[in-house]
Amino acid sequence: MATVPSNPAFAPTLSTRGRLNGILFVALFAVAVTQLAAMPAIANLGISPLIVGIVAGALYGNALRDGVPASWAAGINFSARGLLRIAVAFFGLRVSLQEIAEVGWSGLIVSVLVVTSTLLIGLWCGMKVFKLDRDTALLTAAGSAICGAAAVLAFESALRSAPHKSAMAVGSVVLFGTLSMFLYPLAINAGWLHLDTMGAGLLLGGTVHEVAQVVGAASNVSPEATHVATIVKMTRVMLLVPVLLVVGLWISRSRKAGQAQGNGRIAMPWFAFGFLALVLVNSMQVLPGSVTQAVNSLDTFALTMAMTALGMETRFSQIRQAGPRALATGAILNLWLVGGGLAITLGVQKLLG
């Protein structure tokens, strides 16, 4: 086995090389994950490359982690942290104010009520009923309330929480989001929910976890419902910024009162402001459509890299400690999204005509 030169001048070079090798390793792994996610058997389930990435990364990280050189750890960590923040910021290019305005007040009100109520219920159930730590409860609630795995990533970065906590939250998104994608169209098409096209779009966009799952579910209802559902879902994504800021304020105040769990601090979510800035850029339509599409594709790949790296840093032994309780919290939230989401949708439609 080669020895590391003792001359300190070599250290930065070796450190940089190891970091780059780690990033390249994650990138190559993400390429394989992207190809795997594109297979019809997986793509037809509405499972995004992000979810496939964290699952595949976790399997590799637990079964073959000794095969990764220690010097690569910095690159893997950068992919799970630094690259993650950049990718979440560029997620803003998928949203425009014009699209949100197209659905009107109905979409905004449904989104705000669903996101707020789901976060509060998730925190209360997770921390008070199932005795989860603050970060795990918040990550699980954010994944259900806002935009699935992307929201988990954003909160994980801001909270600086352990990777296994994100994995548990993503597991909830996978299970209950996939169930919703199949069960919602069945109930809507059978007439059990008594929703018109607008109502179906509001419900699907306002309550299904992942963007891909929303599109998958709504496409089995009608093209019109798919259009409405996608815009409402993007409205929920837009709420990521104010929610992160409010959560940061809450944690900061809890720390001052000496009541916070964990490290009691939240990282400054500069990527949230980047997200908002890119929403404005997309709304002004200053970029050609082809450029926006290319950037969005690169952003999806960067998010896949981040999820893969998080999976590699996850240990199943840590998940087993709180996994059932996190899953139970996700189940309660899913029941709320179905029942409470339907009530909110019908109430808003009745109120606004």
UniProtKB/Swiss-Prot annotation:
Family membership: Belongs to the UPF0324 family.
Locations listed in the record: Cell membrane
Membrane-spanning intervals of the chain: 20-42, 70-92, 105-127, 137-159, 166-188, 234-253, 266-288, 326-348
Organism in which the protein naturally occurs: Pseudomonas putida (strain ATCC 47054 / DSM 6125 / CFBP 8728 / NCIMB 11950 / KT2440)
Broad class of where this protein is predominantly found: membrane
Keyword check for Mitochondrion: no
InterPro entries for this protein: UPF0324_pro, UPF0324_YeiH-like
Membrane topology term: Multi-pass membrane protein
Keyword Nucleotide-binding: no
Keywords, ordered alphabetically: Cell membrane, Membrane, Transmembrane, Transmembrane helix
GO annotations of cellular component type: plasma membrane
Name of protein: UPF0324 membrane protein PP_3661
